[in-house]
Amino acid sequence: MGDNRKVRVVVGGVFDILHVGHVHFLKMAKELGDELIVIVAHDETVKRRKGRPPINPAEDRAELLKSIRYVDDVVIGEPGEISIDLIKRLKPDVIALGPDQDFSCEELKKRLRKEGINAEVIRLPYLYKSDRAKTSKIIQRIIETFCE
């Protein structure tokens, strides 16, 4: 009898002001397995890492992500860095990092192995290189268009 276990892929990110780059990233991540779970950064984490609060609260970002066909489930992360406890609960087979996320695949892999998590960690490439696919550039265009 064959193994019917689904391959679970986990990604994480802020996903504030959803754009086409996010959609391409989620599509690529979904192609790595059968089930895609997205961890949305907690508002406190966004504020600490980006130096500003998110435009949209985590609950709204999660709801928007749930509406994307590639996404099977969304959870809101805990404040702070990557939660090993959350990763353990999600039981990923693959953790896919975005091209602009500043985590080292090797360092993350080592940290996970120490905790008994054997997920593959990979970095997905940019598929859509454009200022239209960067939240900071979108915010800048909004300010230039409507505030000057």
From Swiss-Prot:
Coiled-coil regions, chain positions: none
Pfam families: CTP_transf_like
GO biological process: FAD biosynthetic process; FMN metabolic process
GO molecular function, one term: ATP binding
Pathway in which this enzyme or protein is active: Cofactor biosynthesis; FAD biosynthesis; FAD from FMN: step 1/1
Keyword Methyltransferase: no
InterPro entries: Archaeal_FAD_synthase, Cyt_trans-like, FAD_synth_RibL, Rossmann-like_a/b/a_fold
Keywords, sorted A to Z: ATP-binding, FAD, Flavoprotein, FMN, Nucleotide-binding, Nucleotidyltransferase, Transferase
Reactions catalysed according to its record: FMN + ATP + H(+) = FAD + diphosphate
Record has DNA-binding as a keyword: no
Family per similarity comment: Belongs to the archaeal FAD synthase family.
PANTHER family per record: FAD SYNTHASE
Task of the protein: Catalyzes the transfer of the AMP portion of ATP to flavin mononucleotide (FMN) to produce flavin adenine dinucleotide (FAD) coenzyme.
Name of the featured protein: FAD synthase
Organism: Pyrococcus furiosus (strain ATCC 43587 / DSM 3638 / JCM 8422 / Vc1)
